[in-house]
Amino acid sequence: MKAFAYTTSSSEPRIGIETPEGRFNFTQIWRYFKEYKNFRQAPDLPFLQLMVELDYFSKDTFIEVMDTVKSFRSLNVLRLDNDYTIQVPIARPAKIICLGRNYAAHAKEWRSEVPEKPMFFAKLSSSLLAHKGVVEFPKG
């Protein structure tokens, strides 16, 4: 099971969930779950970041919500077609800490030895790019 952020053809943000059965609109599945459980005070969840901030982002949450909604309605109408765009999972991270340069291909590319231990490095939060996003290079 994989969660992802996406926008609809009308640029509305959503959370998607990928299961062996396909990709689904988790934002709408969450709404059905809230209604079924009578969680009227629970917020809508259009962003993965909001799920993280509210401490709802866990495998157990996704499983419980999906299993509950599947028990009373078909998810087929919530299956995603090709009319959506994958977005960055967290749009405004405070920090990006990376783990890398510990595999052979990268070390060879940089003409260096493969480190014995993984290396950590930081990236600017503006370095995130959506799937198939365009990298813009500065002019000049």
Predicted regions and their residues:
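N-terminal non-catalytic cap/leader segment that marks the start of a structured domain
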Residues: 1-118
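Structural signature of FAD isoalloxazine-binding scaffolds in flavoprotein oxidoreductases
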Residues: 114-131
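A structural-propensity feature for long, helix-poor, extended segments
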Residues: 128-140
